[in-house]
């Protein structure tokens, strides 16, 4: 699958490596290919860097892994994403997009994407690199998009990817991510914890 990733911080880089290792073709959307600082990513098989517009145009799936407060600026410069699968992994921990409650709401209004999903926001990037036995979740109105993202989660090695509901459940899924942040970072349990669904 052709996957574009905008934002190569911890989450974006980790997912890029994981999906590339699973055989997906990863296009990193960057401002300046020549001055891109993540050169180590480009040493990985199946990962290449392109200008943002080119990376997006090549993709079937787009992961927008940038801080929530810059999502509006990035989203306003995206074009041709209405029919792509757009993944929002953001949690508004250190700032919100101006004029919006969260990144998902901003992307809904600014991109008009029909296949927007919330996913990969409920655990730390270290766990995303080694997710065996861990659960993750996806929310959105597009059943097609959720099916694809569930498969992408399995490709990374997650044990399960649960359907969390429609777009109206995206804010609640973000709160689940905030719960992980609270336990891991604020309450001091450490980043190597996970929130799993366990039947009793």
Language model features with spans:
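Structural/interface elements that position substrates and couple domains in central-metabolism enzymes
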Residues: 24-27, 37, 97, 159, ...
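A glycine-biased structural micro-motif
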Residues: 38, 58, 80-83, 113, ...
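Active-site-lining helix/loop region of Rossmann-like oxidoreductase modules
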Residues: 6, 135-200
């Amino acid at each position: 699958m052709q996957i574009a990733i905008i934002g190569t911080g911890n989450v974006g880089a980790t997912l890029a490596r994981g999906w590339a290792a699973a055989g997906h073709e990863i296009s990193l959307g960057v401002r300046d290919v020549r001055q891109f600082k993540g050169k180590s990513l480009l040493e990985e098989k199946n990962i290449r860097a392109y200008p943002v517009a080119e990376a997006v145009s090549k993709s079937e799936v787009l992961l927008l892994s940038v801080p929530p407060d810059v999502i509006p600026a990035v989203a306003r410069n995206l074009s041709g994403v209405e029919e792509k699968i757009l993944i929002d992994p953001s949690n508004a921990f250190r700032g919100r997009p101006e004029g919006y409650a969260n990144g998902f709401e901003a992307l809904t209004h600014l991109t008009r994407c029909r296949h927007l999903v919330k996913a990969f926001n409920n655990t730390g990037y270290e766990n995303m690199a080694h997710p065996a036995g861990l659960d993750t979740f996806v929310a959105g109105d597009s059943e097609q998009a959720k099916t694809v993202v569930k498969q992408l989660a399995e490709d990374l090695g997650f044990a399960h990817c649960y359907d969390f509901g429609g777009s109206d459940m995206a804010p609640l899924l973000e709160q689940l991510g905030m719960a992980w942040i609270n336990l891991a970072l604020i309450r001091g349990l450490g980043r190597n914890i996970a929130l799993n669904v366990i039947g009793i």
